[in-house]
Structure formats: C-alpha cells, structure tokens
Amino acid sequence: ACIGVFSLVKIYQHEYIFALWLMFITVVIDAVDGTLARLVNIKKILPKIDGALLDNIVDYLNYVITPCFFLLVKPGMLPPEYSVFLIAAVSITSAYQFCQCDAKTPDHFFKGFPCYWNITILYMFIFNTSAATNAIILIILSILIFVPVKYVYPSRLDYLTESRILKILMHICSIIYAVSSICILISYPNTNIICLSLSVAYVGMYLFLSFYRTYYP
C-alpha cells in the first residue's frame, strides 16, 4: 500500500518511469505475498486479521486507482473530452470485479478480466499508443470484466495442470517475463526488441492458456 501511494506521488511529479518501477514492485509483491502468507500459516498467527480483505484493498489501489491516475495525469494517454468517462468506466467495472463473490473461482482462476490495468498502461507507455487506441483498449478490457473467461492465477497453478514439469515451466516463464519487464524499463526510451518480444509473448501465452482452460477444461 505504501509503495502504491509513492507511485501516486511520482505520477503527480511527472516522474513516469519511476512510477512504473514502483508499480512493477507492487506486482512482484502481489505475486508472492499470498504464497508467503500460506507458507507461514498467517491465519493462525493473526486470526483476527482478514488477509483477503486487505489484499483486495491494496490491489484496488495498485491495480486500479494508480493506473487511472497515471492515465489522467500523463498527457496524451487519453482523449481529453472522454478521459473522465473512460476513467469512470475503468474504476466502476473494476469495483464490480473486486466485489464479486466468485471473482476468484474455487479452482483458483480469475473470472473475467482481472484488472491488470497497471500492466496495460505499461504497454501503452512503451508502445506510445495513441489516445484513441488507448480509449478503445480500455473499453474492450472493461467489457471483458463481465465475460466469464477463467484467467490463469500465475502463482496458483494447481488447477491449471497436473504436470509438475508444466508448472515449473510456467513459473520459469513468469520469471522470464519479470526479467524482460525490468530490461524494458531499464532500456527506456530505447527499445530492447528481445525483451519486449519475450514480454509480449508471455502475455500471448497467458491469454491462450486462459481461454483454452475456459473452453477446454
């Protein structure tokens, strides 16, 4: 949560790369915090703390509010005449996503687009897409929140496959994705084609697996 607030500060100060670094750190923390909590049996240690509620509060800050603020503050990200409506659409549909009782399915998938808005704006920023293109992307992803596709939960792969080897390969791919994202941020404003290709390939693989497991369980 603290890093999310610092991200907002850096966005306000127009230090966009610094803000993206901080947002990347929040994604890494989110990827491992649940695993670490289960590893130490945090429910037993802190029985009166609702970890799931805290996780949702922090995730809404980091995955929704911070990216929305980025889109509003950085010039050229959205068409000025539609920016308020687009941000309203993103924030309201995301609130719906977070409030669903089955937003995370019993077999550990996300139902509907899982509000990866921080990752979305990273690619908008790196590819320098036009405001009109960004608007279309935001509208499509907001609609996908209501489409019951089961998106892979990267840190919980037990129901994705029974193969231990495939699970290990998925974790390796996730690590490669993280490293490639780091290289992309380090290289900016230059473009590291290899790292960018690896990053986009991972997103493609993630979407393929999600749609495949939805329609061919």
UniProtKB/Swiss-Prot annotation:
Q: Name one Pfam family in it.
A: CDP-OH_P_transf
One of the protein's GO biological processes: phospholipid biosynthetic process
Task: Write down the superkingdom of origin.
Answer: Bacteria
Task: Tell me how this protein sits in the membrane.
Answer: Multi-pass membrane protein
Instruction: Give me the reactions it catalyses.
Output: a CDP-1,2-diacyl-sn-glycerol + choline = a 1,2-diacyl-sn-glycero-3-phosphocholine + CMP + H(+)
Q: Which residues form a coiled coil?
A: none
The role this protein plays is: Condenses choline with CDP-diglyceride to produce phosphatidylcholine and CMP.
Name this protein carries in UniProt? Phosphatidylcholine synthase
Species whose genome carries this gene? Legionella bozemanae
What is the name of the gene encoding this protein? Answer: pcsA
